Design a protein with these regions (language model features):
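Active-site-proximal segments of metal-dependent phosphoesterases and phosphodiesterases across multiple
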Residues: 34-76, 107-110
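Binuclear metal-dependent phosphoesterase catalytic core
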Residues: 40, 71-77, 93, 100-136
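Active-site environment of divalent metal-dependent phosphoester hydrolases
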Residues: 10-14, 32-37, 60-64, 81-93, ...
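Active-site neighborhood of phospho(di)ester-bond hydrolases with catalytic His/Asp-centered motifs
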Residues: 2-8, 26-31, 53-56, 79-85, ...
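General small-molecule cofactor/ligand-binding pocket signal
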Residues: 26, 45, 55, 129-131
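Core catalytic region of metal-dependent phosphoesterases/phosphodiesterases
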Residues: 1-46
Length: 136
């Protein structure tokens, strides 16, 4: 299992991520993460079939559109691009790249509800299922 955090970890939640866990953590720093040394972007494998480009998105102008995010994903050979910054949940397909913003469980914006995303990869086929989850 992999926990992916798209930035703006902020405060003590960052330390909770490091406590005993049964998952791999992949995280980038956001524009509100002033302490620490998280990378601004990260590329990693998800299972045997998917390559992920992860960025908070603030440096790629994702408030305007996903063009730079998709370009960076493609330059890095990725079929999935994940970002945060806007705190608005989104799952789209752009130029062969699955673009995912899980939203925010704490500070949703744009009229969205607190949310996160769950990705499941089917064994043997690599088929990806993405579920947007709203918190109660």
């Amino acid at each position: 299992d992999v926990l992916v955090h798209c930035g703006d970890i902020c405060g003590e939640f960052r330390y909770a991520l490091g406590e005993s866990r049964d998952y791999h953590l992949r995280a980038v720093g956001g524009n509100c993460d002033y302490e620490g040394n998280l990378p601004k972007e990260l590329v990693f494998l998800l299972g045997d079939y998917h390559r992920v480009y992860l960025s908070h998105g603030d440096l790629l102008n994702v408030r305007r559109d996903n063009r730079n995010l998709v370009r960076m994903a493609k330059q890095n050979g990725c079929d999935i691009a994940m970002y945060g910054h806007t705190h608005v949940p989104e799952v789209t397909e752009e130029e062969g790249v699955t673009v995912i913003n899980p939203g925010s469980p704490v500070r949703p914006r744009g009229g969205s509800h607190p949310s996160y995303a769950v990705m499941e990869i089917e064994d043997g086929t690599g088929k990806l299922a993405i579920l947007q989850k709203e918190l109660p």
